[in-house]
């Protein structure tokens, strides 16, 4: 939606001066500006810019706090002290923010989502596989029933494997994590 400076200020509950400051900081302008021309903004683009800017500011604050705490060496911190607990909390917040950013940018996804998607795809594949014996029988009527039955048996095995995918994913994830930890642990070539 196209909005002018006043409308944008109303959307954000900010002053027109704040909008001008944001524009100087890189907020996207749709068109206008200059001598006597009203500046227009795409509200969706501005909201996206604002959210990204807000996340960057928050990340920078957390990074600074983590760096300050790292400077006060971790070994100097005593468990149970306020400094120690603050350090733990700040690190946890920084880790959580990094994970959230990775999730928002689709660098990581939830295991439940992967399970859902792969199970859905496996179901569609199973449906296609189910029709193959009949298609083969119609296309090649000269085939004996034993040939079609052989094909059906192997297809049923594949369909069962696909149907069990949602049950296999947690085990495969554990196997992947073990292999990844071994790789990260120093067995790199």
Curated annotation (Swiss-Prot):
One family name in Pfam for this protein: Phage_Nu1
Induction: Regulated by the Fur protein.
Source taxon at top rank: Bacteria
InterPro entries per UniProt: DNA-bd_dom_put_sf (IPR009061), Phage_lambda_Nu1_terminase-ssu (IPR010906), WH-like_DNA-bd_sf (IPR036388)
Other comments on record: Encoded in the Qin prophage.
Family affiliation: Belongs to the terminase small subunit family.
Protein name: Prophage DNA-packing protein NohA
Organism annotation: Escherichia coli (strain K12)
């Amino acid at each position: 939606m196209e909005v002018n400076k006043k409308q944008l200020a109303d959307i954000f509950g900010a002053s027109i001066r704040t909008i001008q400051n944001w524009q100087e900081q890189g907020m996207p302008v749709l068109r206008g500006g200059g001598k006597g021309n009203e500046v227009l903004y795409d509200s969706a683009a501005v909201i996206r810019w604002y959210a990204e800017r807000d996340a960057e500011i928050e990340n920078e604050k957390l990074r600074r706090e983590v760096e300050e705490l790292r400077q006060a060496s971790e070994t100097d911190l005593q468990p149970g002290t306020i400094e120690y607990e603050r350090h733990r909390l700040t690190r946890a917040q920084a880790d959580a923010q990094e994970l959230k950013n990775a999730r928002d940018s689709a660098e990581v996804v939830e295991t439940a989502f992967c399970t859902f998607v792969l199970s859905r795809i496996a179901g569609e594949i199973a449906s296609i596989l189910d029709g193959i014996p009949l298609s083969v029988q119609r296309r090649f009527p000269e085939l004996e029933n034993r040939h079609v039955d052989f094909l059906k048996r192997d297809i049923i095995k594949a369909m069962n494997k696909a149907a069990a995918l949602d049950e296999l994913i947690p085990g495969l994830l554990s196997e992947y994590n073990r292999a990844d930890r071994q790789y990260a642990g120093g067995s790199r070539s």
